[in-house]
Amino acid sequence: MESDPNPSAWNQYINPRDCTQGLCSTFCPQWCTYINFSPPPISYEQFLNDGVASNPNLSPLVIAIFGIFATAFLLAAYYTLVSKYCANDTTNEAASESGRSDIILDVNSPERGDQDDPFALESSTAGLDDTLIKKIGFFKLKKHQNGFKINGTDCSICLGEFNEDESLRLLPKCNHTFHVVCIDRWLKSHSNCPLCRAKIIVPTTQQPEHHVVVMNLDRFTSNVGSAEGNVVVDDHREEVSVSISSHHPSWFSAADIVLRISRDGEEEEGNYDLENGNREKLVDLKRSFSSGGLVLGTQGRTRRSLNICP
């Protein structure tokens, strides 16, 4: 068979769109053979298994470590939030307490007025020593029919009524009366009267052996007045007859008398005439008048409380 010397001459008779001839062309790709270099698709489960097996860093130990760190981070964030919230509450509470204290300190500022003024105000944070508090006079309340009565019927600190045989303490200058327990607790952190804010000045000099303090009672006026009764010693319940007369035409307060007596450890008992400072027995009692009430004083060294009974 003789070959055609010019095969290109046949090409002009070949129709590239005719796929029946079995020729590979653009119009007949089914007769073309291609080499596919891409791997076949795999399932999702096979992909996960192959990924874990091919990556040794994602072991259970690594996952556990990441879990521990995540838990620690969450706990630290929770602790930070709780601490911040509690700190804000504490700050707000301290600010409110400071606001109330500022009001008290502003009212009780020592710069307001003269310090020697009996109604001078000072800071409530300055308290008195126990020794100074104990130097303030006190007495036991006695209520009898037609007897003496003190001004006021209750304690301004605890708002409790004064009952018989209760120990009451009389503040100097303002002469306000309070329960001993209540006012002692107040004076440990304050140096003024809780009712009128008058500054409390306790005498530091040694007191006389015999000292009679007259507490404020119901006020009355009379040109000639008298009061008689028995002074009862609180410690040993001893009675001393006392007669008080006044010919001074002025206002004054009848009162329970706290008589503090001690001379070489012995109590003195007898009849006393306090008119014009005359003595009927043992001691000379002097009388003086002040705006706070009648004050009777004698010479002495230590104190013991006594009360007047009608």
From Swiss-Prot:
**According to its UniProt record, in which pathway does this protein act?**
Protein modification; protein ubiquitination
Family, similarity comment:
Belongs to the RING-type zinc finger family. ATL subfamily.
- What is the name of this protein? Putative RING-H2 finger protein ATL53
GO MF term set: transferase activity; zinc ion binding
- Provide the domain comment: The RING-type zinc finger domain mediates binding to an E2 ubiquitin-conjugating enzyme.
Q: Which residues form a coiled coil?
A: none
Reactions catalysed, semicolon-separated, are:
S-ubiquitinyl-[E2 ubiquitin-conjugating enzyme]-L-cysteine + [acceptor protein]-L-lysine = [E2 ubiquitin-conjugating enzyme]-L-cysteine + N(6)-ubiquitinyl-[acceptor protein]-L-lysine
Task: Identify the EC number(s).
Answer: 2.3.2.27
